[in-house]
């Protein structure tokens, strides 16, 4: 089971009713089911903040020391490593609960990017959600190898949902 908590701190998000708990659960489940190591966990939790440029700028400055609005910020609750996800070793403790982390999305930046990239707002949001969940479970793009692995997984998941890959 995946429990999703959504906080909408900006009214423009209400225009996108399709961005809801059901969509977020479906995408999260699709990602987690790809890794056997998550199979013992019975309950996952994920917190989502749908906000504006002013708040994301504050968060970005506070947590990353970058004074600029960004499209999305991911705050993992666990220190996972993507390489462990592919091993048959059980790297998780015996807990049947896992809080994956928190994700904050910025409406204005996502809207502007979707217009510039000629994508629908929803499809761009879904791509950023997939990207963020992958960060929460230990994926990163600090070097070309990691970036390629993460991008290929994003493409695979986006294709599953019928969304053309952005790369």
Curated annotation (Swiss-Prot):
Stated family: Belongs to the endoribonuclease YbeY family.
Enzyme Commission number(s) of this protein: 3.1.-.-
Swiss-Prot/TrEMBL GO biological process terms: rRNA processing
Record's function text: Single strand-specific metallo-endoribonuclease involved in late-stage 70S ribosome quality control and in maturation of the 3' terminus of the 16S rRNA.
GO cellular component: cytoplasm
Protein name per UniProt: Endoribonuclease YbeY
Keyword Hydrolase in annotation: yes
Domain of life: Bacteria
Compartments where located: Cytoplasm
Residue sites binding Zn(2+) per the record: 131, 135, 141
Cofactor list: Zn(2+)
InterPro entries: MetalPrtase_cat_dom_sf_prd, YbeY, YbeY_CS
Binding note for cofactor: Binds 1 zinc ion.
GO molecular function: metalloendopeptidase activity; RNA endonuclease activity; zinc ion binding
One Pfam family this sequence matches: YbeY
Keywords: Cytoplasm, Endonuclease, Hydrolase, Metal-binding, Nuclease, Ribosome biogenesis, rRNA processing, Zinc
Alphabetical list of SUPFAM superfamilies matching this protein: Metalloproteases ('zincins'), catalytic domain
């Amino acid at each position: 089971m995946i429990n999703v908590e959504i906080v909408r701190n900006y009214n423009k998000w209400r225009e996108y009713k399709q961005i809801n708990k059901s969509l977020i659960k479906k995408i999260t489940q699709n990602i987690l089911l790809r890794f056997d190591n998550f199979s013992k966990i019975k309950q996952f939790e994920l917190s989502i903040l749908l906000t504006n440029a002013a708040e994301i700028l504050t968060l970005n400055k506070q947590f990353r020391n970058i004074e600029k609005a960004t499209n999305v910020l991911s705050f993992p609750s666990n220190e996972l490593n993507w390489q462990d996800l592919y091993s048959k070793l059980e790297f998780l403790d015996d807990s049947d609960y896992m809080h994956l982390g928190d994700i904050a999305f910025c409406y204005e930046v996502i809207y502007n990017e979707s217009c510039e990239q000629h994508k629908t707002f929803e499809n761009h949001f879904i791509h950023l959600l997939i990207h963020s969940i992958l960060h929460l479970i230990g994926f990163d793009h600090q070097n070309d190898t990691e970036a390629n692995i993460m991008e290929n997984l994003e493409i695979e998941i986006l294709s599953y949902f019928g969304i053309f890959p952005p790369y």
